[in-house]
Design a protein with these regions (language model features):
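Conserved RNase H-like, two-metal-ion catalytic cores of nucleic-acid enzymes
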Residues: 1-50
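Structural beta-strand/beta-sheet cores of well-ordered domains, especially the beta-sheet scaffolds
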Residues: 3, 52, 102-104
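Short, flexible loop/turn elements at secondary-structure junctions
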Residues: 9, 57, 110-112
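Acidic, metal-coordinating catalytic cores used for nucleic-acid/nucleotide bond scission
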Residues: 52-61
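Active-site-proximal helix-loop-helix substrate-binding element of RNase H-like nuclease domains
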Residues: 15, 22-30, 47, 61, ...
Length: 166
């Protein structure tokens, strides 16, 4: 289930949450379709040159692409009309790719792998602690992480939003 999508663009921070109830710090949406539609509309309105994130292609965009397909929503947030094309590579030594008209998608995970920065592992929390001096709000790994995110969505949506934006 799609709970929430957040974005940061300069000083703008927005979260679109799948919740009929009003949630402080977020734009409440009635269902997954509305979350996706508002997120895509916001990307087009903000018109960024670069879209970036940690494992943004293999996780975030892959998930959003599948969800859009399932809900019959165009996976289209480029500058020109047309679907964004995503190619997920199963091979660790090849990077997945996404084509978004008029925008570059830079995956922080892939960029770090080719940099000269040495880290213990490539988990977002580890890298955030190493480079920024602090980790993510939710520190659990694997299934425990998903349980904690699920719990935040059910009982503390503000925490989920803060986790997404940090």
């Amino acid at each position: 289930k799609l709970y929430c999508i957040s974005l940061v663009c300069g000083s703008i921070k927005k979260s679109f949450i799948n919740s009929k109830e009003k949630v402080e710090g977020a734009i409440s949406c009635n269902d997954e379709e509305e979350v996706l539609e508002k997120f895509i509309e916001e990307i087009k309105n903000l018109d960024p040159d670069i879209i970036t994130g940690w494992n943004v292609i293999d996780f975030d965009l892959a998930y959003l692409s599948k969800k859009c397909k399932k809900l019959k929503i165009p996976f289209d947030f480029g500058r020109e009309p047309g679907q964004c094309n995503i190619r997920i590579e199963e091979n660790f030594f090849r990077d997945s790719k996404v084509d978004v008209s008029g925008r570059q998608v830079l995956d922080g995970l892939n960029l770090l792998k080719v940099s000269f920065i040495k880290v213990e592992d490539y988990k977002l929390d580890t890298v955030a602690k190493s480079i920024l001096g602090e980790g993510k709000l939710i520190h659990a790994q694997g299934t425990e992480k998903y349980k904690e995110i699920d719990e935040a969505f059910k009982n503390n949506k503000k925490k989920l939003i803060e986790y997404n934006l940090k």
